[in-house]
Amino acid sequence: MPGPLRVLITGAAGQIAYNLSNMVANGNLFGKDQQIILHLLDIPEAKTVLDGVVMELQDCAFTVLAGIVPTHCLKEAFTDIDVALMVGAMPRKQGMERRDLLSSNVKIFKEQGEALDKYAKKTVKVLVVGNPANTNCLIMSKYAPSIPKENFTALTRLDHNRAIYQVAAKAGVPNTCVKNVCIWGNHSNKQFPDLSHAVVTKDGKQHPAKELINDEKWVKEVFIPCVQNRGAAVIGLRKLSRAASAAKAIVDQMRDWWFGTKEGEWVSMSVYSTGDHYGAPKDIYFSFPVTIKDGHYKVVDGLSMDEWSRSLFNLSADELVDEREVALASFK
């Protein structure tokens, strides 16, 4: 067996992390031959709950879990980690504006970015989940300048998975028969879920998803709003944020980043925008379709976009630029 990987999960006493830590410790992410040491970070006030999480992980007797480091200390949490799954963030409370949430959370991610820069391995792969994920990811990367911006991504796989399910259900096929949906832009209700280039395998043949579904009204009035607002819909029914689906998406995104995508398939990931792809603004974390090989992602270029699609793309891009400016202004 290779040496153990040190995997940090922040917000470790929360519901997403409760699901996620079990998936990682069970080998769902890095495989059954890779030993894991889990670093579990949360605030001191969550210590009792975190102790309970640790007890459950111990009681599972996972074969790949080589150690657990529960802590509220940033140095202990970030030292020598290989992977950071940044789940923890301040939740949006009643009466709180998006601007308030941004201001609170970017300060958390500034502090954690500084700790990452100081203590983590320079090869660390960072996946930001806590919202607003794209802008938190940008701030964290800015305060960890010794780590390449390509080593940071924000979670878009949950939106990607939601889109796959909706297309599969509409087409009457299993989820495994849908590939190459796109999520463009922000992880917010201004994201652009796009099935213009998606492919559905049905009756042994591959079909363009839009041609097979052949229902533009459904695409614009059902599919896109459903994916954009799915998180809020789950909260409305459960009275709790999505947890299991988010944990599964985190594992999916990091596993593909670690091991690579299948030939002929892409996935959606929020990555650093250099300004060279589809006219997306520079210096934001923006969701693109990507292929991945040997731990390195590559944006899929050359996909066509009509005028209506471009307007949705630009709407999400504008929101991310606005978020960036609000976030950076909070440090002045």
From Swiss-Prot:
CDD domains: MDH_cytoplasmic_cytosolic. Disulfide bonds: none annotated. Keywords: Cytoplasm, NAD, Oxidoreductase, Tricarboxylic acid cycle. GO terms for biological process: malate metabolic process; tricarboxylic acid cycle. It is found in: Cytoplasm. PROSITE patterns: MDH. This is Malate dehydrogenase, cytoplasmic. It comes from Echinococcus granulosus (Hydatid tapeworm). The lineage of its organism: Eukaryota, Metazoa, Spiralia, Lophotrochozoa, Platyhelminthes. The gene is MDH.
